[in-house]
UniProtKB/Swiss-Prot annotation:
Location within or outside the cell: Secreted
Classification via PROSITE patterns: AGOUTI_1 (PS60024), AGOUTI_2 (PS51150)
Keywords: Disulfide bond, Glycoprotein, Knottin, Secreted, Signal
Annotated spans, Disordered: 61-87
Protein name, entry field: Agouti-signaling protein
Basic and acidic residues bias locations: 63-79
Gene Ontology molecular functions: melanocortin receptor binding; neuropeptide hormone activity
Species this protein is from: Macaca silenus
Domain Agouti: 93-132
Signal peptide: 1-22
GO CC annotations on file: extracellular space
Protein role: Involved in the regulation of melanogenesis. The binding of ASP to MC1R precludes alpha-MSH initiated signaling and thus blocks production of cAMP, leading to a down-regulation of eumelanogenesis (brown/black pigment) and thus increasing synthesis of pheomelanin (yellow/red pigment).
C-alpha cells in the first residue's frame, strides 16, 4: 500500500509541474515606444496619422445655409407635386388589379380582362397586351 501511495504522490507532483510549465509566461509590460516598436510585428509607421481639424464659424454657417436651401427646395418640390383629383368613374366597373369575382361588374379598362386563379378564388383585372 505504501508503494501505491508513493506512486500516486509522484504522479501528482509530476502533473503539478507539467501544468505549471505548460502555460506560456506572462508578457512583459512595454513602458516606452522604443521597446514597442522593436517587439511589435506590425510597424506603426505604416499607418497614416490622424489629423483633427477644428471647424470655424464660417464653415458652420455655410453648412447651415446649404441645409436650409435643401430643406426649402424639398418643400417647394412637395408643394409642386400636388395630387390631382381623379375623375369619378361614370359606370360601375372594376379598376385594374382589383378583385373581379364573377358577380362583380366588368373591368373599366377596355384592354383589361378578368383573370382568375386557384379555382376562381382569386380574380383580378389585368392588362394582357400592351399594344391595345
Amino acid at each position: 500500500m505504501d508503494v501505491t501511495r508513493l506512486l500516486l504522490a509522484t504522479l501528482l507532483v509530476f502533473l503539478c509541474f507539467f501544468t505549471a510549465y505548460s502555460h506560456p509566461p506572462p508578457e512583459e509590460k512595454l513602458r516606452d515606444d522604443r521597446s514597442l516598436r522593436s517587439n511589435s510585428s506590425v510597424n506603426l509607421l505604416d499607418f497614416p496619422s490622424v489629423s483633427i481639424v477644428a471647424l470655424n464659424k464660417n464653415s458652420k454657417q455655410i453648412s447651415r445655409k446649404e441645409a436650409e436651401k435643401k430643406r426649402s427646395s424639398k418643400k417647394e418640390a412637395s408643394m409642386k407635386k400636388v395630387a390631382r383629383p381623379r375623375t369619378p368613374l361614370s359606370a360601375p366597373c372594376v379598376t385594374t388589379r382589383d378583385s373581379c369575382k364573377p358577380p362583380a361588374p366588368a373591368c373599366c379598362d377596355p384592354c383589361a380582362s378578368c383573370q382568375c386563379r386557384f379555382f376562381r378564388s382569386a380574380c383580378s383585372c389585368r392588362v394582357l397586351s400592351l399594344n391595345c
